[in-house]
Regions:
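Bacterial Sec-dependent N-terminal signal peptides
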Residues: 1-22
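Beta-propeller folds
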Residues: 19-149
Length: 149
């Protein structure tokens, strides 16, 4: 009886496998690629996530429950001390009090790049350059959010 069950199961698997025809065109077009959301970064409270606006001028806070915009975390128009036209990416500090704003990104090789970074204080809405000595590569916040390496 077990042998019949295994044989029946194997035949069913073969039939379902033959139903799908995999073509080179489907593979090249990304038909079988996993879908994901780009640029979505969960926040500490677990209720919200942050995402860059389409025009790359704001970091917007959204609700996971409703998917609606809740607040604007960063806006190039309201940032004080420095004016930016837009930005490329951002890195939030572990306590979400500071944000590294990435601008003027220049690729080096494959996934490596240099960029000019600014430190944005969420509470004061002030924007200060990370360095006056040119672009940096891979800056990171310390676990206590007080230093940047």
């Amino acid at each position: 009886m077990k042998k019949l069950f295994v044989l029946f199961y194997a035949l069913m698997c073969l039939v379902t496998l033959q139903a799908q025809k995999v073509t080179l065109q489907d593979v090249a077009n990304g038909t079988y690629r996993a879908q994901s959301i780009q640029g979505l970064k969960p926040m500490l409270d677990g209720e919200h996530y942050a995402q860059i606006s389409k025009d790359h001028k704001r970091i917007v806070k959204y609700s996971f429950k409703t998917g609606k915009e809740v607040a604007t975390i960063f806006d190039v128009a309201t940032a004080r001390n420095h004016k930016l036209k837009s930005f490329d990416d951002y890195i939030m500090s572990p306590d979400e009090s500071l944000i590294l704003i990435q601008t003027e990104t220049k690729p080096i090789y494959r996934r490596s790049f240099t960029a000019v970074y600014y430190i944005y204080n969420v509470r004061n809405r002030t924007l200060e350059p990370l360095s006056n000595n040119g672009p940096q590569q891979v800056p990171l916040f310390s676990p206590d959010s007080h230093q940047i390496a």
